Amino acid sequence: MKPLSSPLQQYWQTVVERLPEPLAEESLSAQAKLVLTFSDFVQDSVIAHPEWLMELESQPPQADEWQHYAAWLQEALSNVSDEAGLMRELRLFRRRIMVRIAWAQTLALVTEESILQQLSYLAETLIVAARDWLYDACCREWGTPCNAQGEAQPLLILGMGKLGGGELNFSSDIDLIFAWPEHGCTQGGRRELDNAQFFTRMGQRLIKVLDQPTQDGFVYRVDMRLRPFGESGPLVLSFAALEDYYQEQGRDWERYAMVKARIMGDSEGVYANELRAMLRPFVFRRYIDFSVIQSLRNMKGMIAREVRRRGLTDNIKLGAGGIREIEFIVQVFQLIRGGREPSLQSRSLLPTLSVIAALHLFSENDAKQLRVAYLFLRRLENLLQSINDEQTQTLPSDELNRARLAWAMDFADWPQLTGVLTAHMTNVRRVFNELIGDDESETQEESLSEQWRELWQDALQEDDTTPVLAHLSEDDRKQVLTLIADFRKELDKRTIGPRGRQVLDHLMPHLLSDVCAREDAAVTLSRITALLVGIVTRTTYLELLSEFPAALKHLISLCAASPMIASQLARYPLLLDELLDPNTLYQPTATDAYRDELRQYLLRVPEDDEEQQLEALRQFKQAQLLRIAAADIAGTLPVMKVSDHLTWLAEAMIDAVVQQAWVQMVARYGKPNHLNEREGRGFAVVGYGKLGGWELGYSSDLDLIFLHDCPMDAMTDGEREIDVRQFYLRLAQRIMHLFSTRTSSGILYEVDARLRPSGAAGMLVTSAEAFADYQKNEAWTWEHQALVRARVVYGDPQLTAHFDAVRREIMALPREGKTLQTEVREMREKMRAHLGNKHRDRFDIKADEGGITDIEFITQYLVLRYAHEKPKLTRWSDNVRILELLAQNDIMEEQEAMVLTRAYTTLRDELHHLALQELPGHVSEDCFTAERDLVRASWQKWLVEE
C-alpha cells in the first residue's frame, strides 16, 4: 500500500488521541496505522477490544479463513445456555470477523472476490448457527416437529439477493424466506403444537436473535418481505404452500429475486433438493423468454423513478451504469435462456458473466469491461461501507472520506478516482442500453422552425405570430402571448440554474409547437404553465419532458382534457414519471392486483420509517388515480369500471394502513392474547356508502366503522399490557391518524366514522355483539338503509361472517309497509331540504329530485320492504346489482329496473366527468330531463302511492 495522503496523515493525529494506553502509537505496526486511519468502525472495535488488534498482528487475515468460521463460532457458542448469551456471542463474533475482513480489504491483502465470499459465508455461518441452536431449544420446549410418518421436520432458510449469490456487501441487511417441508405436529413436548405454530414461533425468535439491537449491536438487519404475500403473509410456509403460491401467483419480480435464492447450511439434504427442484421451473422457463427484457426494463424504470423520488445522486448501486445495471444485464441472459442453458443457472454474477461470454451471447470485450467495472464498483462500495459499518452506496461529500476512498482505491486524489469511476459506469450504461435500453427509440422530430424558438424567446412582434398561430382567434392569440410573457416573468423570480435554463430553452419550443396546434391552445397552455411553474427549479422533471417527447404529448393531452389532472400533476410532480409508459398510463392496474402492486411498492421503503411509509402510500394512490382518470378520459373505462377501480384501490389502502397500524400497536403493547386460540386479528373494517356500494368517485371520502370480537377479560401479551378493548380502540385511532396525516403528498383519504352506533357520541370501535344489539333494538330506519350499502372491506373470515349474518338478519326483519314508506320518504325530504340544490335554474345531480339519491332510496326501501320474503335481496351492497335482484325476484319489472340502472349509471358518469373538469355536481336545469322524469315516476310508484 502506498503511504497515507496528506489529509489522512493529519487525521492520524486525531486517531492517536482516541487510542487507549494498550494501543499506544509506538506499539502499532505500519499496517495498523493505515487501517485505523481509514476505518472508524475498526477504530471503535479495537478500542473496545484491544485483543482483536493483537490477534490481527499475530494472525493476519487469510483468503481462505472463511473455512474456519463455523468451527470458530461453534467454540464461541459452546458455553451458551440461554438466548441472551446466544445473542451476545453472535454479535461479538460478527464484529470480530468483520474487523478482520475490513483489515484485509483496506490493505488489499485478498481479492475482491474473496472479500465477497467471506462476507457472505460469515452471514450464512451466523444464520445457520442461530437457527440450529434455536431449533434444539424449541424442540426441548415444545417437542420436535414431525410429519405424518413421524419424521423430524427442519426449518429451511432461503438466502435471497446478494446473500444467496455469495456477493454480500460489507454493511448489508439480509433477505430471507423460511420454509418447512410437511404438515404435522410436535412430538415429545409438554403439549402438542402443529408444525405451522412451531416454525412461526421459532422464526420469530430467530429474527429477534439476529435483528434486535442490544448493547453489542445487532447481527444483521433481517428483511422478510420477499416471502409470499409479503409482510401480510405467514412468516413460514410449508413446501406445498410455497409451490401453490409461485405456480398461481408468482410475479415477475419474485422470479428475478429467486434467481439468487440459496439454501443456507446443508444444501444437499433430501429436503433441500426437493425445495430446489420445486422452485426451478418457476425461475427458469423451458422456452426462450424474451418478455424478460421488457419486464427488466420496467423494473429499471421503477428504480430510476425511485432515484429521482429520493433525490439520490452519486449512487454507485442504483445510478446509471451502477451495480444494479450490471446485475440486470446478467439476469437478462439467465432468465431468457437459463431454462435451456443450465450453465446460466448460477446464483453468482461473475461466473455467470463468464458463461455468457463463452456462449457468445455478447462480446468478450463487453464481458471483460463489465467484470472489471463490477469488481471496481463492489470494492468501492465495500470500502465506503466499512468506514462506519454503514449501509450506503452514495459517494461522500466530505473531504476526509473522499481522501480515505481515493487512498484505499489506490488513486492520488478524488478527481482521479471519480474519473475512472465515470469511465467504468459509462461502459456499463452503454452495454445496458444496447441490451435493455428502450426498444421504442423515439424518432426525433424535425428541427422546429425558428419561429417557435423566437416565440418562446419573446423575439416575435404580435403581428409576426399570425403565421404560427393562424388557426387561433385573435383573442386566443393574445391570450397565448400573455401566458408566455407571464410565464417568463414568473421564471425571473425563481432560482433556476444554467442547466435548468438550458433544458427549458430546449423544451418550450417543442411544447409550444404541440400546444398551439390545438384549437384549445389558450386553455391548455394556461394549465401547463401553471404546472411548469411548480417544477422549474427541479431540473430532473424538465429533463423528463424534454428527453421523452411521448411523455410531453401525454401531458398536453391529459391537461387539455382535465383540469383535475393538471392540478394533480402540479401538486404532485412525481406523477410525471407515470407519463413515460402509455401501457400503464392508460391501462390501470387490474382490479384484483392493487394489493399486490402496493405491496411491491412498499417493499422499497424501510418498514420502520413511518414517514416514508405514509409518503409512499399517498404517492401510490396519486399514481393510481392518475391512471384511472387517464383511462376514463380515453374512454377505455366505463363508469362502473371507474368506480370499481377506485374502490379496489381504496381497499388496498385500507389493508396497508391496518397492517401498518397493527404492527405499530403490537410492537407497543403486544398481541391480544385471545388470538392465540383463533385465526385472524379479531378486527374488521366495515365500509358504508359509496365504498360499501362499490361506487367511489375521484374525491370520495370513506365511511368506515370498526368492529372487534374480543372477550371481556382479554389482555395483550406485551410488556406494556393493556385491556384488549383499549388495544382495538387505539388501533382504530391509529388507523384514522394514518389516513388523515398530511404529508407533502397530501392526506390519504378523508375518513368519516359517524355511521357507527350512536354516531359521533358512540365508541370509535364497537364489539360485534354490541353492534348487532344496537341494530336490532336502537337503530333508526335510516341506519338500516345505510346497512343496505355496507360490507366488510377488511377483516378475518370469522368476524366477516358474523357481520354478514347480522346484516342479513336486520335487512330481512319484517316491516310494516306503510310505516317504512313514510319513514324513508320523510328522511329523503329532510335531506332534500338540507342538501338540495340552492342554485337557480340548475339541477344537482346527486341531491335534487329525480337524481342519484332518489334511486338509492328506492333500492334501499325495496330491500328493507321485501327482504323478509326474498332473502336473496340482501346479497349485494351496490345499487346496480340490487336493481338486478329486484327484477330477478319479481319485485320490480325488468323494464323499470333497466331504466333506473341506465339513469343511475348515466348520472354517475356525468359526476365523474364533472370531477375531472373540477366542476361542481350540478348542471343546467334542462339536462337529463328524460332520466329525471323516469326516476320521479318510480319514486311516485314506490314511495308515495298507497
UniProtKB/Swiss-Prot annotation:
CDD domains: NT_GlnE_GlnD_like
Spans annotated as Adenylyl removase: 1-440
Statement: the UniProt record of this protein carries the keyword Magnesium: yes
Keywords: ATP-binding, Magnesium, Multifunctional enzyme, Nucleotide-binding, Nucleotidyltransferase, Transferase
Catalytic reaction equation(s): [glutamine synthetase]-O(4)-(5'-adenylyl)-L-tyrosine + phosphate = [glutamine synthetase]-L-tyrosine + ADP; [glutamine synthetase]-L-tyrosine + ATP = [glutamine synthetase]-O(4)-(5'-adenylyl)-L-tyrosine + diphosphate
The enzyme's E.C. designation: 2.7.7.89, 2.7.7.42
Function: Involved in the regulation of glutamine synthetase GlnA, a key enzyme in the process to assimilate ammonia. When cellular nitrogen levels are high, the C-terminal adenylyl transferase (AT) inactivates GlnA by covalent transfer of an adenylyl group from ATP to specific tyrosine residue of GlnA, thus reducing its activity. Conversely, when nitrogen levels are low, the N-terminal adenylyl removase (AR) activates GlnA by removing the adenylyl group by phosphorolysis, increasing its activity.
Family: Belongs to the GlnE family.
UniProt cross-references to HAMAP family, sorted A to Z: GlnE (MF_00802)
Name by which UniProt lists this protein: Bifunctional glutamine synthetase adenylyltransferase/adenylyl-removing enzyme
Gene that encodes it: glnE
